[in-house]
């Protein structure tokens, strides 16, 4: 038996369980530890029986509860090395100085300087090779923005993620900042190279998205193949090849193009979502389903639907029309993954 349960899918958090009788893998941990535990129990999955967490990429909606959950359950996490490093950078607390804070600090320093005794014999002026000499004032160093949590959200959360909500439920809040990125065990994999966890063979494949080293997955066990491909700007040839002959196909149907273009997002965000490293639209998925899709899957799960720029009815209608236009594909069942509650388990 191979079973797939989508715990959550969308711009606010993503997580899926792929399991057999002896092995259970969590794909992404994009909800808080508290919420992940709640949804695992609601879906009939025992969290204590998870054998590991595999990560697609480091955006917040895929890793929010990762560290706390992994430590609580004492299970390994599987990343690409680049994704792990990007996640560590994102999780590491940084002191960020706004321009207003810098001005306030400069004012305080100027006041202190005016009260301090001045030496009677002043030294030379700044040298010619220095265009500006800062005398006793703190320098303002703008810092890089933290990686945005998801391509589909116009607002970026600055700084490291909050852990207090999880800490109250799953563990004590770490006192040492290094604890934020401590994991029980880390296993690296490479896109295109298979690896095994228990009796599940995992094939990661590269996908086009604005992250460090994003991947999709095909999980195979007992002759059954389950594919997960979300957060991709378009379906590249390697992804199309990986998705062939899969019994379950979980694939992105993120936005309706008209809703996105007419919606409230800033134009820069709209461009990013529609770019080749953004998210797959209903229209782009329909083109794949009518063209390169082999019709093999018993179930097609539409995932990562935008709450702002899509409607479940639009996504389902678009996919069903695409599938219904080809006679060999009439046996495909279309399901919608939800943000607020787990999807009914798919058992093969």
Predicted feature locations:
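Active-site neighborhood of phospho(di)ester-bond hydrolases with catalytic His/Asp-centered motifs
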Residues: 27-30, 50-58, 78-81, 227-230, ...
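Active-site metal-binding motif and surrounding structural segment of the metallo-beta-lactamase
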Residues: 33-84
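Short, well-ordered alpha-helix to beta-strand connector turns
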Residues: 50, 183, 246-247
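Cap/insert and terminal regions of metallo-dependent hydrolase folds
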Residues: 237-337
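Short, basic/aromatic-enriched C-terminal tail that caps enzymatic domains
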Residues: 332-348
């Amino acid at each position: 038996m191979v079973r797939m349960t989508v715990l959550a899918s969308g711009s606010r958090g993503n997580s899926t369980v792929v399991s057999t009788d002896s092995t259970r893998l969590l794909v992404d941990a994009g909800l808080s530890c508290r919420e992940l535990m709640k949804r695992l129990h609601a879906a009939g999955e025992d969290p204590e029986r998870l054998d590991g967490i595999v990560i697609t990429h480091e955006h917040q909606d895929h890793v929010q509860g990762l560290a706390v959950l992994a430590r609580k359950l004492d299970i390994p996490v599987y990343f690409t090395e680049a994704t792990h490093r990007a996640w560590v950078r994102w999780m590491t607390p940084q002191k960020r100085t706004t321009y207003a804070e810098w001005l306030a600090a400069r004012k305080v320093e100027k006041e202190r300087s005016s009260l301090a005794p001045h030496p009677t014999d002043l030294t030379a002026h700044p040298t010619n090779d220095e265009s500006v000499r800062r005398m006793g004032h703190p320098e303002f160093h703008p810092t890089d923005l933290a990686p945005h949590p998801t391509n589909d959200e116009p607002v970026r959360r600055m700084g490291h993620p909050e852990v207090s909500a999880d800490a109250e439920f799953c563990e004590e809040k770490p006192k040492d900042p290094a604890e934020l990125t401590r994991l029980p065990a880390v296993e690296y994999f490479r896109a295109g190279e298979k690896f095994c966890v228990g009796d599940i063979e995992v094939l990661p494949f590269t996908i086009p998205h604005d992250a460090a080293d994003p991947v999709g997955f095909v999980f195979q066990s007992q002759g059954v193949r389950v594919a997960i491909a979300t957060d991709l700007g378009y379906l590249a040839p390697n992804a199309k090849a990986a998705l062939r002959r899969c019994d379950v196909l979980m694939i992105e149907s993120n936005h309706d193009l008209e809703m996105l273009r007419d919606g409230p997002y800033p134009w820069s965000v709209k461009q990013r979502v529609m770019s080749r490293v953004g998210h797959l639209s209903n229209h782009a998925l329909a083109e794949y389903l009518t063209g390169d899709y082999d019709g093999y899957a018993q179930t097609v799960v539409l995932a990562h639907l935008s709450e702002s720029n899509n409607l479940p009815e639009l996504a389902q209608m678009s996919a069903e029309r695409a599938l219904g236009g080809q006679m060999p594909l009439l046996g495909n069942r279309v399901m919608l993954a939800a943000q607020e509650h787990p999807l009914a388990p798919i058992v093969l």
